[in-house]
Amino acid sequence: MSGPPASIHTTAIGDAELAWTEEGHASRSGRTAIWAHGLTSSATAQETVGMFDWSPVTRDHRLIRYDARGHGRSTGGADPEQYTWPNLGRDLLGLLDSVSPDEPVAGIGSSMGTATLLWAAVAEPHRFHHLVLTTPPTAGQVRAAHVVAYRAGADLIERSGLAAYEAASAGPPPAVLSGLADARTPIAVPESLLPSVLRGAARSDLPADVELRALRVPTLVLAWSGDPGHPLSTARRLATVIPGAQLCVADTPGQLREWPQGVADFLDA
């Protein structure tokens, strides 16, 4: 991100207030993009640590960045069901009613944000003209171990606090992130809500293949290697199941740095 800090807007979605910003300028009709971040992150955290840089997108698009329910500046409640991926997809559609009510948008997501986009897109595909699915999360049978870890993490926070959870979940980043000074984005969920957020993630999975096969939205899948939390198996599944989807895999930091311009080019194609 560059330039002065963006103004924070809020939109009421059910019983939550979602915080969002906008940057860039739509050069013509239909040039709005929306960024959906990963679990426990926030609208700008992944860019702040240098993981992504969406400035190429903002040169020709109005880019909406928003904090998911319970994350960053957005509010949320204690019910884990609020944080399931289908419900986060409904939140996103509600936000689109406010930020782009009359035109479809380009959706760009990361991990939980990728899942959010997919649930929104299978529900209302006409709301999107492009999908960019970065670092898809675990899914299906591969997800089982992570479900156990999410539930155990929620219990640990309630029993021993956030610091204990952070220590237990610390680990080396994948090699593709080795060039970053700190590849771990700070947890942007209040400690009081984090157990609910994790339990919501534990209840979640991607849409069924039959729903994904029905999508007719140009889709780019961006994955990196060496990360069990974002396995190539999910990325390959999405690229196989979604009609016409393209897959690009980054194995090195240099390849990762090519993603932002690649996304801008994909949206312009």
Predicted regions and their residues:
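Conserved HGGG/HGGXW glycine-rich cap/lid loop of the alpha/beta-hydrolase fold
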Residues: 2, 13-75
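Conserved alpha/beta-hydrolase "nucleophile elbow" surrounding the catalytic nucleophile
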Residues: 37, 109-111, 224
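Active-site loop/oxyanion-hole signature of alpha/beta-hydrolase fold enzymes
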Residues: 48-56, 64-105
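Flexible "cap/lid" loop of the alpha/beta hydrolase fold
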Residues: 115-158
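Hydrophobic, aromatic-rich cap/lid helix
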Residues: 181-210
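Short beta-strand/loop motif that positions the catalytic acidic residue
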Residues: 215, 221-223
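Conserved alpha/beta-hydrolase "acid-adjacent" motif
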Residues: 228-234
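Catalytic active-site module of serine/aspartate enzymes centered on a nucleophile-bearing elbow/loop
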Residues: 244-269
